[in-house]
Amino acid sequence: MKAFIAILSIAIVLLLIVSIKETSAKDCKQECVKRYTKGDLTNFLKAEYEPKNRGGICYCEFTCHVKFYIYLKHEMD
């Protein structure tokens, strides 16, 4: 029974980590589009998020060869 609870606890922690990363990736894409095209997704190519402690680096790339980085800061509660 203790092994089951331990495995379940680990699974929940991993699920939380994945959901935080997905949210940050969405934030990354939204920030890229908002800063360069003011919400227009026409020239958007990709956004890659690299998590760090209390924030991360967001790489933005557009089809018109525009590339830049954004530093996202996420407050930890």
UniProtKB/Swiss-Prot annotation:
The keyword Iron does not apply. Keywords: Disulfide bond, Neurotoxin, Secreted, Signal, Toxin. Residues 26-46 form a propeptide. Residues 1-25 form the signal peptide. Belongs to the scolopendra neurotoxin 3 family. It comes from Scolopendra mutilans (Chinese red-headed centipede). GO terms for molecular function: toxin activity. It is found in: Secreted. It comes from the Eukaryota. This is Putative neurotoxin 1. Its main location: secreted. Contains 2 disulfide bonds. The lineage of its organism: Eukaryota, Metazoa, Ecdysozoa, Arthropoda, Myriapoda. One of its GO terms (cellular component) is extracellular region. Expressed by the venom gland.
